[in-house]
Structures are given as structure tokens and as C-alpha cells.
């Protein structure tokens, strides 16, 4: 019972983590461009 639940949690966390990293990198890139760095 625990393994499928853990597998589902991991499958749910991976895309959220990737999207979070992408958004953070995009915001940092935009902020850097605004400051001319």
C-alpha cells in the first residue's frame, strides 16, 4: 500500500519541482536583464 502512494507522490513532485526551477531561473534572468548584469 505504501509503495504506490510513494510512487504517486514522487511522480507529482517531479513536474512541480521542474516548473519551480524553470520559473525561478526565468525570473532571475529577467531581473538580471533589467539591472543590465
Swiss-Prot record:
UniProt-annotated location(s): Plastid, Chloroplast thylakoid membrane
Molecular function GO terms recorded: electron transporter, transferring electrons within cytochrome b6/f complex of photosystem II activity
Membrane topology: Single-pass membrane protein
Keyword presence, Plastid: yes
Top-level taxon of the source organism: Eukaryota
Stored InterPro entries: Cyt_6/f_cplx_su5 (IPR003683), Cyt_6/f_cplx_su5_sf (IPR036099)
Coiled-coil ranges (or none): none
Single GO biological process annotation from the record: photosynthesis
Recorded GO CC terms: chloroplast thylakoid membrane; cytochrome b6f complex
Transmembrane portions of the chain: 5-25
Keywords, sorted A to Z: Chloroplast, Electron transport, Membrane, Photosynthesis, Plastid, Thylakoid, Transmembrane, Transmembrane helix, Transport
Function recorded in the entry: Component of the cytochrome b6-f complex, which mediates electron transfer between photosystem II (PSII) and photosystem I (PSI), cyclic electron flow around PSI, and state transitions. PetG is required for either the stability or assembly of the cytochrome b6-f complex.
Family, as annotated: Belongs to the PetG family.
Quaternary structure, from the entry: The 4 large subunits of the cytochrome b6-f complex are cytochrome b6, subunit IV (17 kDa polypeptide, PetD), cytochrome f and the Rieske protein, while the 4 small subunits are PetG, PetL, PetM and PetN. The complex functions as a dimer.
Designated name of the protein: Cytochrome b6-f complex subunit 5
Organism: Rhodomonas salina
Lineage: Eukaryota, Cryptophyceae, Pyrenomonadales, Pyrenomonadaceae, Rhodomonas
Gene that specifies this protein: petG
Amino acid at each position: 500500500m505504501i509503495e504506490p502512494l510513494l510512487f504517486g507522490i514522487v511522480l507529482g513532485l517531479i513536474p512541480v519541482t521542474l516548473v519551480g526551477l524553470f520559473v525561478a531561473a526565468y525570473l532571475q534572468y529577467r531581473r538580471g536583464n533589467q539591472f543590465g548584469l
